[in-house]
Structure formats: C-alpha cells, structure tokens
Amino acid sequence: SLRKTVQDLLVQLQEAERQHQSERVDFEATLSRYQREAEQSHVALQRAEDRVEQKEAEVEELQKRLLGMETEHQALLAKVREGVTALEELRGKNSDCRAEQEKAANLEKEVAGLREKIHHLDDMLKSQQRKVRQMIEQLQNSKTVIQSKDTAIQELKEKIAYLEAENLEMHDRMEHLIEKQISHGNFS
C-alpha cells in the first residue's frame, strides 16, 4: 500500500514535472519572441531618432540660408530705394546735360536689374520656406512615430516582466506542490 502510494506520487510528480517543463518551454519561447520584438523595435526607434536628428540639422541649415537670403533681399531693396531716389533727384533737376542723362539711363538699368534680382530672390525665399515647412512637418511625423515605437517597446517590456513574474510564480507553485506531495507521501 505504501509502495503504491509512493508510485502514485512519483507518477503525479513526473506528470507535474512534464507539464511544468512543457509550460516552461512555451514560456521561454514566448519570452524570447517578446525580447526579439523589443530589440527590433529598439533598433527601429534608434534609426528613427537618427533620422530626426539629421532632419533637424537640415532644417537648421535651411533656416540659416533663409536668413542669409532675407538679409540679401533687404540689402537689394535698400539699393533699389537709393537708385529710385537718385533718379528722382536727377529728374527733378531736369537738366539737359548728356552726362546726367547717361547717368539716369544707367541708374534705370541698375534699378531694373536689381528689381529682377529681388524677384528671383523672392521666388527662392518662398521655395525655401516651403521646404522648411515640409521638413518641420516630417520631423513632427517622425517624432510621433518614435513615440508610438517607444510605447510599443514599453508594452513589450511590461509583457516580458509579467511573463517572468508568472514563470516565477509557477515555479514556486510546482516546488510547493512537489514538497507537499513528498511530505504527504511520507506520512501515509
């Protein structure tokens, strides 16, 4: 009778150990899958962060160029104003002197050239501003992607922690069950 009880207990113990082993294998597979996913997400996150840094540097560079172009634009406008003022003065004198007329004609040409330059600069400025706006938009999108990847990584880490805790609990339960059955077997 004692032998039968011991045999029954051993069979139960082996069954429990088999089940525990099978659960442990499942758990470890799930855990390593989650760890792999977390690692892949982390790598993707790093890449996205690098791209954001690069874009921020490009935006900064574009903004510097814009500032330079705006300064040039202001300088050209000032030159045009000077030219127009000089022309008006010449016209005001209403002199017939050929040298003055030549000077006025040259000034008019210069003013026309400057206006052309300003027009060209205006177009470039608008194009650069559009570019900067688009890049800032892309940056914001990238940052949103990074935040969602961050959240996904956090969720995976929480799942891993939960599974590890669950495994520990299962392990403790198994040990407790085995101890209980062994001590129970000794008394019967």
Curated annotation (Swiss-Prot):
InterPro entries for this protein: Tuftelin_GRINL1A/MYZAP/CCD68
Main location (coarse class): secreted
Gene Ontology cellular-component annotations: extracellular region
Domain of life: Eukaryota
Compartments where found: Secreted
One Gene Ontology biological process: biomineral tissue development
Record keywords: Biomineralization, Coiled coil, Secreted
Coiled coil: 1-181
A GO molecular function held by the record: structural constituent of skin epidermis
Function: Involved in the structural organization of the epidermis. Involved in the mineralization and structural organization of enamel.
Family, as annotated: Belongs to the tuftelin family.
PANTHER family: GDOWN1 (PTHR23171), TUFTELIN (PTHR23171:SF4)
Assembly and binders: Interacts with TFIP11.
Stated name of the protein: Tuftelin
Organism: Sus scrofa
Gene name for this UniProt entry: TUFT1
